[in-house]
């Protein structure tokens, strides 16, 4: 049996919602824990303003990958106000449709399509702020209403970086210079086309950002206090609903964040760097709380010293762990991660960036062009968030900086 298109699946989901007595108000596209947390925060904010919304959640995680969230994690699912669809399972997306987005902005309504009555309030297309949704999502959303508004949700650090630079990294994975050149040309041409489409959509459809910062440009973006407030409310709500004590005491601890970038970097280089970082944490008189990346294969995890606490529970995000804690960590060390950014903005927890150390080791070990480009991008990213992430250029500085932060904590 063939899998239906997204538009067909969305129309069926609308009929399902209407059968339960709800009007569809939004179509959401995302795949991560942060996406769902941000969606829940936005839905809670709207409910506080007296607008309780119902809608369709499209989990567009890649085929074969484990979903990062459950349907019941979404606000309103237990009340029957949410229908969840998964790409490759409940629907398929016509990828090239993005190129035809201009013609979709005012699409004809097919005779088999149910047009949502937008006389009372708008219909929302909600997506992560890293790029833009595929044209098929626009087609599905526009089949519901001409009165369309877009909500771009927080994607973490990726929200503030160029998606083109990320795509270029994958081109560098090609060993053949010819294939690499062809892929680079293809990506650059596609980036120009998408930028043109972005301009069209931004002029035709109102877009509202709901993320850590109010703007994406500049070296010192303004914090969105509304987002911070509602995300913290979400953390507290989830904690109270769990009915168990999830709090940890992070006093005297430094959180070290694992990574899952074995496509670009030799894991032995990362492991060696982490072991040196752990030694520096100990030299500062502090303890390491190691958080492996949820997507990091267990076979890649290096042998840790016995005094290092390892958190191997991916059901809670780092941000949730910190929110629930009875005492906050001294610092968060990593490669310009979202947890460092949110930790700094939400709770004033210092971030320590070690991307320069990684880049130096990659160059010393004659890492490939993809590894060098990858680490260069990390270094540039850390530099952009210098207000929240202290970029370290020598391993010895880590213990010095940590001692300074620990002394501030004691005051």
Please identify what each model-predicted range represents.
Residues 4-49, 253-258, 268-282, 286:
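N-terminal beta-strand-loop-alpha-helix module at the start
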Residues 25-191, 339-341:
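Active-site and donor-binding regions of nucleotide-sugar-utilizing enzymes
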Residues 64-69, 92-95, 160-165, 317-324, ...:
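Short, charged, surface-exposed secondary-structure boundary motifs
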Residues 154-255:
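A nucleotide-sugar donor-handling region in carbohydrate enzymes
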Residues 231-298:
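Conserved catalytic-core segment of nucleotide-activated headgroup transferases in glycan assembly
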Residues 294-344:
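Donor nucleotide-activated moiety binding/catalytic core segment of transferases
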Residues 336-342, 350-365:
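Short glycine/proline-centered loop/turn elements that form peptide/ligand docking sites
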Residues 364-411:
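Leloir-type glycosyltransferase catalytic cores
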